[in-house]
């Protein structure tokens, strides 16, 4: 939503401001298509040459994140607190045997079935199930600090992979000004081949070449770089829910009372997604 609004404002102010000061938009509009063939084609080729199909799919998904925004809302954070707390309470009161069916087959679990949105996130499900599976097979003898280190390593690996679209967008932003110069230089070369033409024609050709530099800079700093920043924000926002999972599991393994465990996890959530104290503890009653 805001990305689309930002694009409209950006293009409106740049081209509208130019027209408002008496500039003629027609030469720019006529030059943009062939300049964009060079700049866009070169950028596309560079991205394809430097990445595998997996990264290219992630790159496309990065644009979706820019316009869609974060996946998880306040209700999802409330649900993940309920889900993990229920499993940890079951592990503590009923033992590993009670929790094992739920972590071995989450899709058939009556606990996970209450949270279909969370069940769609395979990273979240694996984080919960793999960690609890580790606790179950160790018969509760694991050092909580060691479990935390294992979870941190897994989350770092996931983040390194998830943040790649933002890095690719930023790399594109860094390259676009240079690709704009490439288009401009080619335009100048073309102009030099027509040096015997009248000044009016040469001026139009030089102006057309300069549109390449203009487009490269505009695309880099007006679109690609802001998109990269927004993509990074969305990825980091969605990753916060995994920290809630870790907080509840580790605090429970340390033997802290469940209310303290839940409040520690709740208070660590950003205010925009943080469930109210009453919502959490009223919802936990009877679970």
Regions found by a protein language model. Give the residues of each.
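Alpha-helical transmembrane segments of integral membrane proteins
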Residues: 2-9, 34-38
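Large intracellular
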Residues: 19-163, 237-287
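Helix-termination/interfacial motifs at the ends of transmembrane alpha-helices
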Residues: 5-8, 12-27, 150, 154-232
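N-terminal start-of-chain detector that recognizes signal peptides
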Residues: 1, 62, 71, 222-223
């Amino acid at each position: 939503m805001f990305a689309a609004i930002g694009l409209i404002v950006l293009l409106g102010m740049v081209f509208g401001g130019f027209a408002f000061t008496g500039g003629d938009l027609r030469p720019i509009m006529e030059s943009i298509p062939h300049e964009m063939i060079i700049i866009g084609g070169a950028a596309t080729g560079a991205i394809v040459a430097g990445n595998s199909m997996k990264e290219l799919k992630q790159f496309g998904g990065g644009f979706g994140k820019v316009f869609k925004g974060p996946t998880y809302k306040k209700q999802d954070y409330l649900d993940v607190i309920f889900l993990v707390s229920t499993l940890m309470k079951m592990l503590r009161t009923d033992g590993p045997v009670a929790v094992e069916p739920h972590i071995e087959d989450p899709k058939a679990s009556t606990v996970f079935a209450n949270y279909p949105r969370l069940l769609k996130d395979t990273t979240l499900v694996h984080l919960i199930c793999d960690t609890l599976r580790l606790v179950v097979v160790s018969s509760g003898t694991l050092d909580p600090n060691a479990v935390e280190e294992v979870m941190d390593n897994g989350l770092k690996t996931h983040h390194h992979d998830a943040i790649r679209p933002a890095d690719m967008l930023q790399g594109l932003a860094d390259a676009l000004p240079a690709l704009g110069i490439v288009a401009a230089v080619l335009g100048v070369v073309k102009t030099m081949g027509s040096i015997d033409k009248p000044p009016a024609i040469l001026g139009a050709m030089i102006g057309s070449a300069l549109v390449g530099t203009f487009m490269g800079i505009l695309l880099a700093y007006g679109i690609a770089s802001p998109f990269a920043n927004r993509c990074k924000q969305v990825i980091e926002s969605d990753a916060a829910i995994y920290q809630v999972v870790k907080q509840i599991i580790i605090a429970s393994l340390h033997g802290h009372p469940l209310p303290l465990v839940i409040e520690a996890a709740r208070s660590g959530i950003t205010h925009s997604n943080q469930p109210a104290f009453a919502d959490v503890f009223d919802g936990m009653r009877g679970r």
